[in-house]
Amino acid sequence: MAEPLWSDSAITLSPSMLLVPASSELYDIDCNALHEGMRRTRVLYDFVRAAEDDNGADYCILDCPPGYTVASVNALFACDEVIVPAKIDGFVFDGLESVRAQIRSLRRARPDVRIAGVLVTMRNSSEVVREGETLLRQRGIPVFEQVIRRTDKVVETTFEKKPLIDYCPRSVATQDYRRWVAEYLGEELGHGEV
């Protein structure tokens, strides 16, 4: 069986944007890297640079689970910015501290990697979530103004295996993601562009 490669998992979203989604193939890459004694931390870095150079990609989105896996370390090593999606709950602060610790541990090799911001997801309007979000914003970590509201439509897309924008283009989460992308890119959305 051929060795899985990062490029095998890449999905072209547009001519200038690639997505490497979290998948079981990334687990296989993790296992292969462990067998090789962790010498492979530059594999994803090299893939991202090749995508930029060969394909003219402006953005490579690397979706990986939190934790100290080879895939996560590879993703942090390869990126310039980290966007941390976070559901406001009792675990969010520990998770953010873990991401910050991982980034600090890579500083010598990649001093410019930074947290672009925390993207609050699955947000509802309960008092405990509002209080947690306030605490998060007081932590000194950048937090995007735009939040992604909770809706069952997001869950439905996982069963349908369709992107949210195709499955339900008018859902509140779709609108929120569009606004967040505009915020991240520093763009202004005109009326009716959501």
Residue ranges and their predicted role:
Residues 1-194:
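P-loop NTP-binding core
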